[in-house]
Every structure is written in structure tokens, then in C-alpha cells.
Amino acid sequence: DLHLCDRRQRQMCIRDRSYTVLPEMLGCKEFVNADEIAKGLSPFNPESVAIEAGRLMLQRMDDLLSEGEDFAFETTLATRSYVKFVERTQAKGYFVTLLYFWLPTPEQAIERVATRVSEGGHNIPSDVIRRRYANGIRNLTTLYTPICDYWTIYDNSAADGIHKVAWGVKDEIKEIVDPLSYQKIVDYERD
């Protein structure tokens, strides 16, 4: 999940609970999310318009970037596709902040999707969730934290809210707040 905000400190964030934390953490009001676009296009069958929603999301991001607006967007980091976009935003003077909302296991992500489906949201097959989970963690530390101006990893598994795991600036780790969780992330990407 990836996001951008504030003209003087353009930002880029990442994962689950984004709706509640983004405005508060970043002062960011514009949140571009393909899932929400799909719900707007086809509320009863958002899966049927997923490709169109993804295209509209990318177009909206390009529009906001060319207008110099602050914004955030969501991604699982499962692909390399946003690396060039991050570099483009930085070239335009954006300060990119990555917020990664981590779940300790792919099974927890599968449970979250099942809950979302029970509440009327769209489904994602378990094998796709597992693949995106592994790729997202690997890309987090190999591709995205090294290029983001500021990054924070949060544990998003607790019922009482998110908890900071670590934070840094580009490829420099400034503080590991939760060494056990951070080690799980590092070890997972090696497996």
C-alpha cells in the first residue's frame, strides 16, 4: 500500500487501516485506491471492473502529480511497478514517505480478506494473497525503503491498533522499536 502527500513534504505510505491513519498521520486528504474506484464503478461486483479501476487509479495519480497536488495511494508493494513513479515524484520535488502496515503471516491477510468479503467487499484468492504477501515483504526492504525519503513499518495485527516496528530514512534504519517483529520481516524475505 503506497501513498503520497503535502507539497513541501510529499509522501508515500502503505497498507491496511489507511483510511483512519492517513489524514491524521500525514495531513493527507486525497487517497487514491483502486478498490474504492472499483466499488464506485460497480458496487455489487467490483471484481468485474478491477482492470478499469486500476487504469483510472494510475491516471488519477498522474493527474495529481502533474497538478502538484498532495496525495496518497495504496499498493501491496508486490510488484516493482511503482519504483519509477516514486522516482518521478521525487524529481518533481515530492518528499516520499512510505508507511507499511505489516501482518505477521499471510494467513492473517487471508482472514482480513474473508472478513471484508463477509461485509460485502471483494474477494482475492488465497494463493494470490500469499504471493503478494511474500513479494511485498521482499520488495519493501530491497526496492522501496532504499528510495523513499522516510519510511515506517507498523505491525497491523493487534486488536488495539497499530504498533511501530521500525523507521528510517532511505536505506538507513534510524530505530528498531520492535526487534522481534523486525527480525520476522527480515527473516521472511530470506526464506
Where on the chain are the PLM-derived regions?
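Conserved nucleotide-binding/hydrolysis micro-motifs of P-loop NTPases
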Residues: E24, E36-A38, A78-T79, W102-Q108, ...
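A glycine- and Lys/Arg-enriched "phosphate-lid" helix/loop adjacent to the NTP-binding pocket
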Residues: Y94-L140
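NTP-dependent small-molecule kinase module
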Residues: T142-D191
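Conserved substrate/cofactor phosphate-moiety recognition/catalytic segment
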Residues: Y19-E69
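Flexible, glycine- and charge-enriched loops at secondary-structure boundaries
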Residues: H3, E47-I51, T75, S126-I129
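Glycine-rich phosphate-binding loop used to anchor ATP phosphates in small-molecule kinases
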Residues: E52-L103, G136
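Conserved beta-strand scaffold positions in the cores of enzyme catalytic domains, especially
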Residues: F31, L98, W151-I153
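Single conserved hydrophobic/aromatic residue that forms the stacking wall/gate
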Residues: D1-R10, I14
